[in-house]
Amino acid sequence: MLRILTLSILATSKLASAHVVAWHPGMYCLGGNDTSVDDPNTNLAVNPLWDLPKSKWWFQADRGCDKAPPVDGVFLELPAGQNFTTELAHNRAQTTLSFNGQYAGEWPDGKDHPEDWSGTGTPPGCIQDDGAIHTNNQTMAGGTVFAISYQSDMSQVTMENLVVFSVLEHTPWKRIATYEVPADLPPCPDAGCICAWGWVPQGCGEPNMYMAGYKCKVTGSSSTKQLAQAQVPKYCANDTSECVGGAKQILVMNQADGNNVVAPDNDFVAYNEKWGFQNGAQNDIFM
């Protein structure tokens, strides 16, 4: 009976909101926005951000996620010069963080799909059986990023001190997502840093955006380098000399205020080379 009930809840929650976030024990809203309750079936953190004032979209304040930190002492650990893994899924229940991982599969929805999964037609249209990943195929997935601020208090994090340090091209795609960490990323303060995950879908569905928060800390680092101030990315597909190098901000679009980019004619906003983001660790973000 319990398994039937659980499956029913999973099906209902997926239909209600089937989007994606990077799940990890160090995230805000891991168990929902009530820290007295650990909801193994929550999808609150996956919901997109659209037409909101900055006071609401910033770290998902619209749903109270900015007030729901992870358990004390739990961090997203960032091993300098190495990599870390998160789980991209529509619901916490579809990860290894709930129900002993029994509903976690190779893909974000926990279902089976072909390795060359794509929409129909030539060129392929949007994938219709799971629009939650907002893409036509893997190569057209918009890319996701992690950014870091060397502030321990979220109220002190700004667009200028939140720097993208890792890019994973052609994601979201499969559930397991591994991001590279710059070797020179310095240690965090004793209370840790604040990190953010970002994604702007490249077409296929509403042109919204995603941002989630994490308590994080850099491990295995003795670097004394400092991060440069994050600059606004610039579309540079037609002229690479126009690309913004070095430390960059997350992409913000289609909000009521606080936007830093707009979609170019006949193209998309995305974390890719067209916007100056190279895949992997961002090793040029230091002063």
From Swiss-Prot:
GO terms for molecular function: metal ion binding; monooxygenase activity. Glycans are attached at residues 33, 83, 137, 238. It is an enzyme of class 1 (oxidoreductase). The keyword Transcription regulation does not apply. Disulfide bonds join 188-193, 195-216, 236-243. InterPro entries: LPMO_AA14. It comes from the Eukaryota. One of its GO terms (cellular component) is extracellular region. Its EC number is 1.14.99.-. The keyword Transmembrane does not apply. Keywords: Copper, Disulfide bond, Glycoprotein, Metal-binding, Monooxygenase, Oxidoreductase, Secreted, Signal. Pfam families: LPMO_AA14 (PF22810). Belongs to the polysaccharide monooxygenase AA14 family. Lytic polysaccharide monooxygenase (LPMO) that has a broad substrate specificity with strong oxidative activity on pure amorphous cellulose and xyloglucan and plays as a bifunctional enzyme to decompose some specific network structures formed between cellulose and hemicellulose in the plant cell walls. Catalysis by LPMOs requires the reduction of the active-site copper from Cu(II) to Cu(I) by a reducing agent and H(2)O(2) or O(2) as a cosubstrate. This is AA14 family lytic polysaccharide monooxygenase A.
